From Swiss-Prot:
The enzyme's E.C. designation: 6.3.5.3, 3.5.1.2
Name recorded for this polypeptide: Phosphoribosylformylglycinamidine synthase subunit PurQ
Molecular function per GO: ATP binding; glutaminase activity; phosphoribosylformylglycinamidine synthase activity
The species this protein was found in: Lactococcus lactis subsp. cremoris (Streptococcus cremoris)
Encoding gene (name): purQ
Function: Part of the phosphoribosylformylglycinamidine synthase complex involved in the purines biosynthetic pathway. Catalyzes the ATP-dependent conversion of formylglycinamide ribonucleotide (FGAR) and glutamine to yield formylglycinamidine ribonucleotide (FGAM) and glutamate. The FGAM synthase complex is composed of three subunits. PurQ produces an ammonia molecule by converting glutamine to glutamate. PurL transfers the ammonia molecule to FGAR to form FGAM in an ATP-dependent manner.
Self-association and partners: Part of the FGAM synthase complex composed of 1 PurL, 1 PurQ and 2 PurS subunits.
GO cellular component: cytoplasm
Keyword tRNA processing: no
Amino acid sequence: MKFAVIQFPGSNCDFDLLWAIRDVMGAEAEFVWHDEKSLAGFDGVLIPGGFSYGDYLRCGAIASFANIMPEIKRLAKEGKPVFGTCNGFQILVESGLLPGVLIRNEGLKFVSKWQVLKVENNQSNFTTEYAKDALINLPIAHGEGQYVADEATLAELKENGQIVFTYADENPNGSVENIAGIINKEGNVLGMMPHPERAMEELLGGADGRKMFASLLKNFLVTVKN
């Protein structure tokens, strides 16, 4: 199974993401520049955090029109895994691959710290290695992470079990329903503001991110082989 780690101008978590999936988890992965027009040969996509295009206009807005995006949408439509963290999550909502929008933090300040999350749905392809209602600790680092959506969208997210992670001990950005991460209806696209790729080794502060990548590899490897 081979992953494309997409690089945009301003990405700064790309090496973390590559290290997590390749060096720690043992999967095949390589960088793909945003201006490429093909993802032939790849079985999944990882979109890193950072400040794509300097966060001009809106976070993720310009990146959503990058040349590589039609290919990312193609893989998503084919049921291949697509994961976006932080700015990657912003790109996924701006491109329409996930519902809702991410706006400026409620406190109007950049927040950088370790954050306790609750695993709301451990039956998704990205969370099966976690226990239901497990509390995990992952880093966050963002200024525009407040997730908002209309009532109809929120009702649909709840009904379909698309709310995968919520903020547990406190809400750091004002996200509605404490939402920290969601999946699409089909279950193959996950976006989240926290950074699991930064929680892969106890030596570095914690390893709660490992199970997210382990779930991804376990569940999608079967799909790719079939």
